[in-house]
Design a protein with these regions (language model features):
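Active-site-proximal beta-strand/loop segments in catalytic clefts of secreted hydrolases
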Residues: 17, 42-45, 70-73, 98-100, ...
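Active-site metal-binding motif and surrounding structural segment of the metallo-beta-lactamase
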Residues: 37-38, 47-97, 212-230, 243-248
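Active-site environment of divalent metal-dependent phosphoester hydrolases
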Residues: 22, 48, 73-79, 102-104, ...
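Active-site neighborhood of divalent metal-dependent phosphoester/pyrophosphate hydrolases
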Residues: 67-78, 92-120, 251-255
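C-terminal regions of proteins
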Residues: 236-240, 244-245, 253-326
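Metal-dependent catalytic neighborhoods of phosphoester/phosphodiester hydrolases
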Residues: 78-90, 105-115, 234-238, 263-264
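Short, aromatic/basic amphipathic alpha-helical patches
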Residues: 53-56, 107-126, 261-273
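Core dinuclear metal-dependent hydrolase active-site scaffold
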Residues: 1-64, 130-221, 293-326
C-alpha cells in the first residue's frame, strides 16, 4: 500500500470550482507539511477565457495528478479534461469513469467521444500513455493509502456509491431519457475522522437506491448533487431517514440557464441543519465579478488549529443566504 509521510501537519484541501454560467470541477489535495503530496480531480470544465482547474494546479506546482474521476459525459463536467489527460496524467494515474454502453455514445459531444476513444484504446495502442483505468459503480473502492507520521497512521480511501448497478442494467432495455446522469459516479473521500460526499450529478432514482451500508457516518461535507436541482433533491430525505446529522458544509455549482441551484432544494439542506451552504457564484448575474468561483475547504486532520474545518471563498463564490420565514 502506498504511504505518504508527514512530520508536522496533515491536511485535506477540497476546491469546488464553478463558472458564471455552468461547469463543475473538484480539485483536492492531501497536503503533508504544506506540500501537495497527492492530487485528485473530479470532473473538469473550462471556458474559452478561463481554466480555473489549471490555475489551482499551477498554484500548487502540481506536475502530475494521482487520481482522476470523470463522473459522466455531460459537457459541463467534461470540457478541458482531454488537456488534463495529456498534460498531467502519467503511468501512475488512476483514471476512473463509468462504463457507457456503445449505443449511448452518439448522445454526447465530440470531446466526450474522444475521451472514450482514448480510454478504450489505452491498452491497445503503443502510442498512448498507459495508466490504470477503473470503471466505477456502487460499492467500489477506487483508492486506498496511508498517511504516516507522529507515531500515527491515517487511512485515506475513495469509495464509490453510484452509479447503481441495477439502474444501469435496466437502462439496456428501458428508457433512454436523461442518459448521462444515470451513469453519474458518486464518491466518498475518507481521511482520518472526516467523510466527504461528492455526489456528481446523481439524481433521485439513484439516491433512493444507495445502500445504507455505503453511507459511512458521519458525513462532514456534501457536494450537492446535480447543481441543486429538484431531480436530485431527495438526498437530505435519504440521510435524515438514516438519522444522520447534517454536515458542517454543503456546496453547489451553478447551471444558470436552468436556474440551478433551486432555492427550495437549498432550503431542504438548511432545514436539515447544514452549518453553511456555499455556492460557486451568485444567481443574480450582475453580481458576478471574475467569471468563476472556488469554494476552498481545508480539513485539519491533526486538529491543530482553532477551527478544524476552514473555508475560503475565491472569485465569485458566496455564502448562501437563508430565506427568513415570514
Amino acid at each position: 500500500m502506498r504511504k505518504l509521510f508527514f512530520e508536522d501537519s496533515l491536511k485535506l484541501e477540497l476546491n469546488v470550482i464553478g463558472y458564471q454560467n455552468q461547469g463543475e470541477s473538484i480539485v483536492f489535495f492531501i497536503k503533508t507539511d504544506g506540500i501537495a503530496a497527492y492530487t485528485g480531480l473530479v470532473d473538469c470544465y473550462k471556458t474559452e477565457e478561463q481554466n480555473a482547474v489549471k490555475m489551482v494546479l499551477e498554484k500548487e506546482q502540481v506536475e502530475k495528478i494521482d487520481f482522476v474521476c470523470w463522473t459522466h459525459p455531460h459537457d459541463d463536467h467534461t470540457l478541458g479534461l482531454e488537456e488534463i489527460w495529456e498534460q498531467y496524467c502519467t503511468n501512475d494515474t488512476c483514471f476512473c469513469c463509468t462504463d457507457i454502453i456503445q449505443a449511448d455514445l452518439d448522445l454526447y459531444s465530440e470531446e466526450a467521444k474522444l475521451l472514450f476513444q482514448n480510454i478504450r484504446g489505452i491498452h491497445t495502442s503503443s502510442k498512448r500513455k498507459k495508466m490504470r483505468i477503473m470503471y466505477l459503480k456502487d460499492s467500489t473502492q477506487a483508492e486506498r493509502l496511508l498517511c504516516v507520521g507522529n507515531t500515527k497512521k491515517y487511512e485515506f480511501r475513495i469509495q464509490s456509491f453510484a452509479p447503481n448497478s441495477a439502474i444501469l442494467g435496466e437502462r439496456l432495455i428501458g428508457s433512454r431519457d436523461q442518459q448521462g446522469n444515470a451513469y453519474s459516479i458518486g464518491l466518498f473521500l475518507f481521511l482520518g475522522q472526516y467523510s466527504i460526499m461528492l455526489a456528481g450529478d446523481v439524481e433521485n432514482q439513484t439516491i433512493r437506491r444507495i445502500a445504507d451500508g455505503d453511507i459511512e457516518y458521519p458525513v462532514d461535507y456534501i457536494k450537492i448533487p446535480h447543481h441543486g436541482s429538484k431531480s436530485a433533491s431527495f438526498l437530505p430525505d435519504k440521510m435524515r431517514g438514516l438519522n444522520l446529522l447534517a454536515p458542517d458544509i454543503a456546496a453547489a455549482t451553478l447551471f444558470r440557464i436552468h436556474s440551478l441551484p433551486e432555492e427550495q432544494v437549498l432550503a431542504k439542506y438548511d432545514n436539515w441543519g447544514c452549518g453553511e451552504i456555499y455556492l460557486t457564484g451568485n444567481m443574480e448575474k450582475g453580481k458576478d465579478t471574475v467569471g468563476y468561483g472556488i469554494v476552498k475547504t481545508t480539513f485539519d486532520i491533526l486538529e491543530q488549529n482553532e477551527y478544524d474545518i476552514e473555508t475560503e471563498l475565491i472569485g465569485d463564490a458566496v455564502v448562501h443566504q437563508k430565506e427568513m420565514a415570514g
